[in-house]
From Swiss-Prot:
Coiled coil region boundaries: none
Keywords: Ribonucleoprotein, Ribosomal protein, RNA-binding, rRNA-binding
A single GO BP: translation
Subunit annotation: Part of the 50S ribosomal subunit; part of the 5S rRNA/L5/L18/L25 subcomplex. Contacts the 5S rRNA. Binds to the 5S rRNA independently of L5 and L18.
Encoding gene (name): rplY
Biological classification of the source: Bacteria, Pseudomonadati, Pseudomonadota, Alphaproteobacteria, Hyphomicrobiales
Protein's name in the database: Large ribosomal subunit protein bL25
Species in which this protein is naturally found: Rhodopseudomonas palustris (strain ATCC BAA-98 / CGA009)
Length: 230
């Protein structure tokens, strides 16, 4: 079950750049609640509280109850903008969640068993192809992260999204079987592997040559042709 956090907001009676700048000077961040076939609702939230929520992580996969004039609006953040210089939030968008809503989310990928993977023990290196997974999930069952067990991966082996059991009701939005992680061989691995394969063949050649004279020596001499009768 998705945990729901509460966020207090106030209505924003005026729109436009001038009104937005006034909100920011007052220590508030302008935003909007939209979706679910309802009219957009301009709001503002306290900048300090919003910044803490963003810094806590997983902001875009967290469901909130935005409290506005005593009424709760079930939402999920869809986007936010940061000041390019001072790096604090200057705008936020919330998507209104209706009953039974299903949404697309980008969920972090957590890897388990990195240190014990056979490929790592043999000198390979993990190449994490993607750090997030694009999923479609019920609003009440959004996973905070997806865990992938890589403890059995060897050199040259990849883990795909189809190798992971997703939570009930959650599915990938990609038509392709996304590669999540692979183990890259160490430098010179292919050359060493080829040399190792060639060594037994090279050793077998002299042995085969040595067996040939011995086999010839053991072979019985050919019988002389019988004399013709006169």
């Amino acid at each position: 079950m998705t945990s729901v956090l509460e966020l207090k907001a106030t209505a924003r009676p005026k729109s436009g750049k001038g009104a937005a700048r006034a909100e920011r000077r007052a220590g508030r961040v302008p935003g909007v609640i939209y979706g679910d076939n309802q009219s957009p609702l301009p709001i503002s939230v306290e900048e300090k509280e919003l910044r803490l929520r963003i810094l806590a992580g997983r902001f875009l996969t967290t469901v909130f109850d935005v409290v506005l004039d005593g009424k709760k609006h079930r939402v999920i953040p869809r986007d936010y903008h940061l000041d390019p210089v001072r790096d604090f939030p200057i705008h936020v968008d919330f998507l209104r969640l209706g009953a039974g809503a299903t949404i697309r989310v980008s969920v972090p990928l957590h890897l388990k068993g990195l240190e014990v993977a056979p490929g790592v023990k043999r000198g390979g290196t993990f190449n994490i192809v993607t750090h997030t997974v694009e999923l479609e999930a019920p609003a009440e069952n959004i996973p905070q992260f997806i865990e992938a067990d890589v403890s059995t991966l060897d050199i040259g082996v990849s883990l795909h999204l189809s190798d992971i059991a997703l939570p009930t009701g959650v599915k990938s939005v990609s038509r392709d079987d996304v590669t999540l992680v692979t183990i890259v061989p160490p430098s010179g691995y292919n050359e060493d592997k080829a040399a190792a394969g060639a060594a037994p063949a090279a050793a077998a050649a002299p042995a085969a040559a040595a067996k040939a004279p011995a086999a010839a020596a053991k072979a019985p001499a050919a019988a002389a042709p019988a004399a013709k009768k006169k």
